[in-house]
Structure formats: C-alpha cells, structure tokens
Curated annotation (Swiss-Prot):
Intracellular or extracellular location(s): Apical cell membrane; Cell projection, Microvillus; Membrane raft; Cell projection, Lamellipodium
GO BP annotations listed: cell adhesion; cell migration; epithelial tube formation; negative regulation of cell adhesion; negative regulation of cell-cell adhesion; podocyte development; positive regulation of cell migration; positive regulation of cell-cell adhesion mediated by integrin
Chain's gene name: PODXL
Subunit details: Monomer; when associated with the membrane raft. Oligomer; when integrated in the apical membrane. Found in a complex with EZR, PODXL and NHERF2. Associates with the actin cytoskeleton through complex formation with EZR and NHERF2. Interacts (via the C-terminal PDZ-binding motif DTHL) with NHERF1 (via the PDZ domains); interaction is not detected in glomerular epithelium cells, take place early in the secretory pathway and is necessary for its apical membrane sorting.
Species per Swiss-Prot/TrEMBL record: Oryctolagus cuniculus
Protein name according to UniProt: Podocalyxin
Length: 551
C-alpha cells in the first residue's frame, strides 16, 4: 500500500502543476431573483496560470465534469493562486450524491497560521472530487488543506450575494458535462431564481474536473498562500427574467484572510438577472438593489389649485367662483359692493406650474338680507330652530351676485316630531311600524276610531227609518181623516132625502142657496152663468119670503 502511494506521489510530480483561481467578487448581499435563467459556458479567454504541487504520496482521483445551478455562499479564505507543497499523503476519491451544495467558507487557521479554504457545491445529482493534503510541519511551514467536497446545502450562510456562474476546469481527460438544476434554500429568506455570473476556472492536481458551472448566492476570492494572479473567464449567458432588473454597482472585493499578500485580480461588475427576492441588509459590501426596498419619497410637482368654494367669516354665507350671466341664474343687483370679490393670482412655479389663490373681502351681506333669502325658501323659517346657508357667487364686472344655493337645516325636538307622527300613525303602520314610544307616551289609542264608522252608519240608518215612519204616519192619518169627512157628508145627505134632519140651519142654507142661484139667474142676467152672487143684491124681502115659503 505504501509503495502504491509513493508511486502516485511520483506521478503527481511529473504532472503539470495545478492552479486555483477564482474571481474576486463582492461580499454577500441581497440576492437577485429571476423567474427563468439559462446559462451556457464559453471558452476561456486565457489559460490559467499553473502552480506546482508536491506531494509525498500518490493520489488517485476520478472526476466527472458537471454543471450545476445552485446557491453558493463564498467567503475569502486564502491568497490568489500560489504553489503549495504537501508532504503528507493525499487521497482522491469521487462520490456522487443526490443533492449537494457548493459553499466557500473560511476554516480555522492551521498551526502554520495559514487559513484554509473550504468550497462546497450544491446540486441534485452531482459528482464531486475530493483531494485532501495532510499537513506536514517538517516539509512546509505553511501547509494548507484544500478540499472540494460534496454534501447537502450548508446552513451556515448568513448573508446573500449576487449569484454567479463559476467554471471550474482542470487539464487532463474530461468527460461530458452534467447539467443539474437545484432549488436554492436561502435560510428563511425568499427563494430566488438562479441567475448568471462570471465563470471561474481552476485546475486540480490529479484528473480533470470538467467545466463546473454553478449559480449560487455568494461570491468570494479563493486563493492559495503564495499568490499568483487568477484568470477570469467570462461566460456568455442569456437570462430571461420577469420584472425590471435592478443594476448593481461594482463592489470591492472581499479581503483575504491570509497573512501573506495576495495579488489583486480583475473583478468585473456583476449584473443581476432579476430583482432581489428579499430585502436583507448587507453590512460588508454593496449588492443589487432589492425589489422590496422602499423608494425615497419625492415631491410631486404639478398644477395646484385651491378649493373653488371659500368660506367667509359668516358661517351662513359662502362665496364661490365668479359666474357669467345666463338665463338659468338668479341674479341680485346690489347697490353696495358685492359680498364676494375674488382675486385670482397666477404664479409660475417650476415647469409651467400655475397656482390659483382666491381671496374674499370683509364686505358681507347683512343679516336681514340673509334672513329674507332664508324666509323666501322656507316661510316658517325660525332662526332659533333652523340653520340657513346661502351660497353666492359674484358677477364679473358688476356688484351683482348670483344666488346659487340656499340650504336650510331644521332641528326639531323629539316632542314635535312625535306630535307630527301621531297624526300619520295609520300611514306608519302601513309602512311596517308596529309601535312608537316617547317616554310614557305611545301611539294613539285604537279605541278612538274603533266604533266611529259603525256608529255613523247606525245613526244614518236610524234617521232614515224615522223619516220613513213619519212619512207613513202622515199618509195614514190623512186618509183616515178624509174617510171620516166622507162618511159624515153621506149620512147627512141621506137624512135630508128622507125628510128627517137634525140641523135646520143646513136646510135653510141649502134652500137659500138654491133660491139665491135662481134669483141670480133671473135678476142678474148680465152675469150669465156666474155662480158668485154678492149678498148685497139680495133683499130682505126676498129673504123673508124665502123663509116663509120654506116654513
């Protein structure tokens, strides 16, 4: 086993030295969110510088190139590319997991005072290569532990940064790239969509990790203790996002935690592919503007006008804007000055702004005029009970005013309203009102009108019946009296015919009447057939003879 390790170390010495480079990127900040992002790797513009790596034991490593879309939180932990010598044996292995995370975080410093870098990627099905170099204090004063490990998404990330696309490549045999898409977890923040960023490429000691394209939530500078400038390979990408992308100003690269000086590497400004999903504050660097950040309030400029109606000191009268005379307006010509005089002042402000101010003088209509207008609208106007409001408007170029509106508000006491409603209780019942109470008083009693109609009908019927009875009695009494008279006359005539009479006066009168009729015919021939004979024409002699003859 030891011989195999020694042979592997010898082979590593013969291989080209690897170099590890990564773009300096801004500190983690708010992560932009995009609904849909498509990325594709582009060929590197320049080869990455190589560095020699010496190991005392051989290492075997089989790697599979992969392309992942995953959030990655990276922080600087070492100087950019430098040579690393490892005297301890190292072993490389390839593992495949269903879900992994790529995270760059700072590890504790080793005994030599050199911090180590830990890079972790996240993808669903992903192949990762691991190479661990053991520390040998005798061989190197500043050994480092560099590993590329695959594991589930780490939860140590405390901030978010613009997503970037990194390309990790090593010389040697390569395999077809594997593309994986992951769902990022932002530790309680809103879940953003993947976006593009710059590509970073670095080779490893043994084998070749194909182009690894990752889309993460953080960025940092990965370097080795004895720095060499890293090569930045831009990536051609096309992103389709929803919403308006917010530009991000370039932010300074994160400082290296290594005590050795590190060479600066070019860091282009990252352009987010979409608005950020959460408004998380970033205290270490500037990131893209979050879509949930409140915009600063700005003063809105525009034409401003005052209310068309300005109330004057008298609450009963208000003045409106001037009116032009028309046939539909009620105009009052005043001998005094108009109660409402408006002065329009136009002032230019800003870009063609116009402000209109309205003023009214102290010349108000007298109380008598207002009272007359209110009494005209309501004859029973009572100033102690009613409130009247008159809206006037001046006429242009004259002292006349326009009466636009007269409003009267009547304040009635509950007792007055109750008395008015008592007279309309029947109408209220028809509308569904069942009861009405004011203190101890209630609705009008129903007994008052309960028997009124039947009583009236009864009285009318009795009066008609009495009239009918009186008419019948009068008719019957008249017929009875007429029968009695007829019967009496009949009896008298019968007695006269039989020669027996009880009333001699009647007989004398009858004989005298007969005689008078004859005499009238004989004596007064000029009268003709007249039955009216004056008594003066009769003589006593005739009467005596008549009496004697009758006896």
């Amino acid at each position: 086993m030891r011989s195999a390790l020694a042979l592997a170390a010898l082979l590593l010495l013969l291989l080209s030295p690897p170099s590890l480079s990564q773009e300096k990127s801004p500190q983690p900040g708010p992560t932009p969110m995009a609904t849909s992002t498509s990325t594709r790797p582009a060929p590197a513009s320049a080869p990455a510088p190589k560095s020699s790596v010496a190991a005392s034991v051989p290492a075997e490593q089989n790697t599979t190139p992969m392309t992942t879309k995953a959030p990655a939180t990276q922080s600087p932990s070492a100087s950019p590319g430098s040579s690393v010598e490892n005297s301890a044996p190292a072993q490389g292995s390839t593992t495949t997991q269903q879900s992994l995370s790529v995270t760059t975080k700072a590890e504790a410093k080793d005994a030599g005072g050199v911090p180590t870098a830990h890079v972790t990627g996240s993808a669903r099905p992903v192949t990762s290569g691991s190479q661990v170099a053991a520390q040998d204090p005798a061989a190197s004063k500043a050994p480092s532990n560099h590993s590329i490990t695959t594991k589930p998404l780490a939860t140590e990330a405390t901030s978010q940064a613009p997503r970037q696309t990194t390309d990790v490549g090593t010389p040697g045999p390569t395999a077809p790239p594997v593309t994986n898409s992951t769902s990022p977890d932002l530790l309680g923040h809103a879940t953003p969509k993947p976006s593009e960023g710059p590509q970073l490429s670095f080779p490893t000691a043994a084998g070749s990790l194909g182009p690894v394209t990752g889309s993460g939530t953080g960025s940092g500078t990965l370097s080795t203790p004895q720095g060499k400038p890293a090569t930045l390979t831009p990536v051609a990408s096309s992103a389709e996002t929803q919403g308006m992308p917010s530009p991000m100003p370039p932010s300074p690269a994160s400082p290296s935690s290594s005590p050795f000086p590190s060479s600066p590497s070019p860091s282009p400004a990252l352009q987010p592919s979409g608005p950020s999903a959460a408004g998380t504050e970033d205290t270490t660097g500037r990131g893209p503007t979050s879509s949930s950040t409140e915009l600063a309030s700005t003063a809105l400029h525009g034409p401003s006008t005052l209310s068309p109606t300005s109330a004057v000191r008298d609450q009963r009268v208000s003045c409106g804007p001037p009116e032009r005379p028309t046939e539909q307006l009620l105009i009052l010509n005043l001998t005094r000055s108009s109660p409402c005089i408006h002065v329009f002042q136009r002032q230019s402000q800003g870009e063609g702004e116009t402000e209109i101010s309205m003023h009214s003088t102290d010349s108000l209509p007298e109380d008598k005029l207002v009272t007359l207008l209110c009494r005209a609208a309501k004859p029973t106007f009572n100033p102690a009970q009613d409130q009247c409001h008159v809206l006037l408007a001046p006429m242009l170029g004259s002292h006349a005013v326009v009466v636009k509106e007269i409003t009267i508000k009547t304040n009635l006491l509950p007792t007055a309203v109750f008395e008015l409603l008592k007279d309309r209780w029947d109408d209220l019942r028809e509308e569904g009102v069942s009861d009405m109470q004011l203190g101890d008083q209630g609705p009008p009693e129903e007994t008052e009108d309960r028997f009124s109609l039947p009583l009236i009908i009864t009285i009318v019927c009795m009066a008609s019946f009495l009239l009918l009875v009186a008419a019948l009695y009068g008719c019957c009494h008249q017929r009875l009296s007429h029968r009695k008279d007829q019967q009496r006359l009949t009896e008298e005539l019968q007695t006269v015919e039989n020669g027996y009479h009880d009333n001699p006066t009647l007989e004398v009168m009858e004989t005298s009447a007969e005689m008078q009729e004859k005499k009238v015919v004989n004596l007064n021939g000029e009268l003709g057939d007249s039955w009216i004979v004056p008594l003066d024409n009769l003589t006593k002699d005739d009467l005596d003879e008549e009496e004697d003859t009758h006896l």
